Amino acid sequence: MKKVIVISTSLRAGSNSDMLAEKFAEGAKASGNEVEKISLRGKEIKFCVGCLSCQKTGACVFNDDVPEIMEKVLNADVVCWATPIYYYEMSGQMKTLIDRMNAMYPKDYRFRDIYLLTTAAEAEEDTPRRAEIGLTGWIDCYGKSSLKGHLFCGGVTDARDIEGNACLMQAYEMGKGV
């Protein structure tokens, strides 16, 4: 059994990326894994100010929801990120959280397998490329981990447009395969 954390970064209710995250989580649970889905919707996540206090003390100077999320990520075997693509890039919330996770850098971590779920109005295959590159930059800082899978579902604009889309089953199967 693996400990799986699924981080849904969209702030929109009924978002397509959140629905993919839910299916991934369901698949991972169906395989007997311990799964927790974290939605950034309603979370307080302040911007990193680059003070690097976290590198000296191991903790960020801000008191918000990030330390709790970070602790869960550090202790997970699998981390799945779900993000809508905005202007061909990951959501601002996802990037802000990644920046704030700088405090994790000197710490030991369990995660090895990273997954990325992306959705966008644009349907071209290379639409999420920059988001994947951005996440890979974070992954590269954790030498024992790697990107194990990326699922992109394009052509979904409005909330819940993804309902009935084959991508939902693909997310479920990807989760089941962790």
What function would you assign to each model-found segment?
Residues 83, 154-155:
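Residues that line or immediately flank small-molecule/substrate-binding pockets and catalytic motifs
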